């Protein structure tokens, strides 16, 4: 591994430990020339998954799009960025563990709504209103009634 300080091409590993719940290896290294220490992370490279959009276009899966949507839905709500990242991690893992090459944006949206419903109902309704493109207040009320019915059962 090239030293980020002096550019020397060789270093030794001083410490290795799992990170990110075992999905990453964190290594502490020391340059054999300048003796400065630095940290590297090793992660399995996943095969790209394509997302099929509503208009049938395909684009590479981008977790930041999910996170941005969740952040907007959770604005001014008691939901931490750690909780939001956990949702995105869970969804990303479910997608990759499905062993599929493609997934529809609709399926991803449903996964997000399912997770938000369990975490914060207001954030869920906000996300659903944009995702399902509520046309008027009646559509909004219908979704709230469904949520209340599920809560009672």
UniProtKB/Swiss-Prot annotation:
Gene Ontology molecular function terms on file: ATP binding; DNA binding; zinc ion binding
Gene Ontology BP terms: negative regulation of DNA-templated transcription
InterPro entries in the record: ATP-cone_dom (IPR005144), NrdR-like_N (IPR055173), RNR_NrdR-like (IPR003796)
Highest rank taxon of the organism: Bacteria
Keywords, in A-Z order: ATP-binding, DNA-binding, Metal-binding, Nucleotide-binding, Repressor, Transcription, Transcription regulation, Zinc, Zinc-finger
Cofactor binding: number and manner: Binds 1 zinc ion.
All copies of domain ATP-cone, residue ranges: 49-139
PROSITE patterns: ATP_CONE
Family: Belongs to the NrdR family.
Name of this chain's protein: Transcriptional repressor NrdR
Record organism: Caldicellulosiruptor saccharolyticus (strain ATCC 43494 / DSM 8903 / Tp8T 6331)
This protein's encoding gene: nrdR
């Amino acid at each position: 591994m090239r030293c980020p300080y002096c550019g020397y091409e060789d270093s030794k590993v001083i410490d290795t430990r799992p990170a990110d719940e075992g999905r990453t290896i964190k290594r502490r290294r020391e340059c054999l020339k300048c003796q400065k220490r630095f940290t590297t992370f090793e992660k399995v490279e996943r095969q790209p998954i394509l997302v099929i959009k509503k208009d049938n276009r395909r684009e590479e899966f981008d977790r930041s799009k999910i996170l941005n949507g969740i952040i907007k839905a959770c604005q001014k709500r008691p939901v931490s960025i750690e909780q939001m990242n956990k949702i995105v991690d869970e969804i990303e893992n479910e997608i990759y563990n499905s062993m599929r090459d493609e997934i529809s944006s609709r399926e991803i949206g449903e996964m997000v709504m399912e997770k938000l419903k369990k975490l914060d109902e207001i954030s869920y309704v906000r996300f659903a209103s944009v995702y399902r493109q509520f046309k008027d207040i009646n559509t909004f009320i219908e979704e709230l009634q469904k949520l209340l019915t599920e809560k009672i059962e």
